[in-house]
Amino acid sequence: MIKNVKMIACEHSDYIKPKRMEYHQNNLLKTWDLVEVHDSVAILLYHEERQTLIVVRQFRPPVFLKNQDGYTYELCAGIVDKDKTLVEIAHEEILEECGFLVPLEQIERVTSFYTAVGFAGSVQTLYCARVNESMRVSEGGGIGVESIEVIEISVEDAKVFTMDETKAKTPGLMFGFGWFLENREVVTKR
């Protein structure tokens, strides 16, 4: 339960750096407020035994400001803030958030895209991995106080879930589910 919410000034952050860009475009001086942030990885996890897509549900304060709930459904994901390859970071996030130990060579890159283009312009790289119970080493849930809930969505319900506006979800999840449904035969037959 979320309570005792208050807004305070952000004097310093390890995750964001607010900036104002000045530039000339067509001989006009313009300014744009933006936030420098880390890039990220996201992983679409397909549970081959249960025929489900694994997502995480967690509290996101900015979403709370909009809907007074704040819980979002997202792909397993993490920021790129370590001196490791993107696939190594994806590997760590799968283990930490969802509890599966997936061999690096079984985590396949799908594509990358820009997110939050109006204020951040970070790049998210999407991966896909098949998992099964033999790979499960923990219940997941994140590290420390992340309070991540692991949820499985049946493949049959994926399209309806994607379009359900009552559940806050990220564009990365929506794109990932759409990509999976378009490429289901290839992913499930590997």
Regions found by a protein language model. Name each.
Residues 10-13, 64, 113-124:
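Acidic pyrophosphate-coordinating catalytic loop
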Residues 26, 47-50, 59, 130-134, ...:
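Short loop segments at secondary-structure junctions
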Residues 17-28, 116-136:
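Active-site-adjacent beta-strand/loop module that shapes the phosphate/pyrophosphate-binding cleft
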Residues 1-6, 69-73, 82, 109, ...:
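Nudix hydrolase/Nudix homology domain
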Residues 102-110, 117-122, 136-140:
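Short conserved catalytic/interaction loops centered on acidic-Pro-aromatic/His motifs
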Residues 8-50:
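Acidic, metal-coordinating catalytic segment for phosphate/diphosphate chemistry
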Residues 32-35, 44, 52-92, 136-137, ...:
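Conserved Nudix-box catalytic region and its N-terminal flanking loop in Nudix hydrolases
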Residues 81-113:
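Internal catalytic-core helix/loop-beta-alpha segment
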